[in-house]
Amino acid sequence: MQSRYTALQEALAGYDKTGVPLVAYNGKALLPAGFSDDIGTYYFIPKIAHTFSLSITQSINIFFVGMLLISLILSVTGFFLLFRSWTSRFISVVGLLGLAFLAFRIGDVYLIFVYTILSLIPIFLYLIQNEKLKTIFTAFIFLSGIGIGTAHYSRSHAGTAVLIFLIIMLMLYLKRGWREKLGLVALLLVGFSVSAIYFNALLSHRETYLVLNQPNYKPVVGSHPFWHSVYIGFGFLNNDYGIKYSDSSAFNKVRSISPKTIYLSQEYETILKGEVIKIVKYDRHFVVYTAFAKIGVAFFYLLVCANIGLLASIFYPKGWSMELAFWLAIGFNALFGILVVPSSAYLLGFIALATVYGITSIGYAIQQGALSDIKNFMHRKEIQIRQTT
């Protein structure tokens, strides 16, 4: 995205000029880096560029491609440990490579959903079933919390689905006492809090620096725009409101109501929230019709990515608690496509979870003798055909 690329260039210029993370410089004044976006990438990418004297393009490639490769290696390792069958391992590699290729083609901050899912879930599934690795499992839970928190600050809610998955698995699937389960959940949340405290400290330092060094600077509270995205999401289908899936569509609407409102400010979000509520209240048919159109696209992605894993989960169940954990996580990541637009970018976290679900379901089915059952079924059918002829 060109606007994000420009913002990263300004973030690097600000870091080179001041030495303070998350301070941008546009050639005229200092300003907050990534004000209307999630700050993680505006911290890590300029840091890489500054530390190793690289261009912003090189740093973007190192960050996104490097993280994709690391998460791919971790996920393959996790599934190789989880499954003993080489058939299951082969299927996992094929599925993960396909997902990695799609993620690479989409690119940008949407990749962070894939990083979190691939880096954590396969290894977690292995560790939760191995009582001999309690110490490693405990450390993994804490580090997972830090990773999820970092992902959240790099792309809003990029780790929330994984957090949901881990908590449900810890509380309902793990075969330990309730006190120990609650302790692990608390440890997971402590890890998340470590990331939150760190990034909030960076923001606080940034704001203090700008107040002292940039004349007339007013502290801001940056957050990922929600109602802006929901409003333009109504532009998925042709409509009577003139809404299109374009930032300018929301911007023009706000300006028609309040010409002096600053783009993506709190007042801006409040105005769009009111417009969304009006549409929901007075045109429910349009809202429901649009929602089901988006759900239909998401369902198609589910069928493609989970594919025969859906059938495998029916005939060879993994246990209700694991199913619940997966489906609540998948459902959460589907919300991005349903609330905004069901593009492959917005649904990349949904696609990644569906793929991991499919791989896991097939692997568990093979462990329960699915291949032997299929072979026996085909043999019986062959005998029946011979008898009838």
Task: Give residue spans per PLM region.
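Aromatic- and kink-enriched transmembrane "portal" helix at the membrane-lumen/periplasm boundary
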Residues: 57-61, 68, 93-116, 148-149, ...
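Transmembrane-helix motifs of polytopic, lipid-linked glycan transferases
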Residues: 62-86, 119-123, 306-309
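Membrane-interface transmembrane helices that cradle and orient dolichyl/undecaprenyl
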Residues: 118-140
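Membrane-interface alpha helices of multi-pass inner-membrane proteins
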Residues: 140-155, 167, 187-196
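Transmembrane-helix signature of polytopic, membrane-embedded enzymes
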Residues: 76-101, 134-135, 320-324
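Membrane-proximal stem/loop segments at transmembrane-domain junctions that anchor or position
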Residues: 1-27, 205-294
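Hydrophobic, aromatic-rich transmembrane alpha-helices
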Residues: 70-79, 296-320, 370-378
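Loop-to-helix entry region of an early transmembrane alpha helix in multi-pass inner-membrane enzymes
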Residues: 30-73
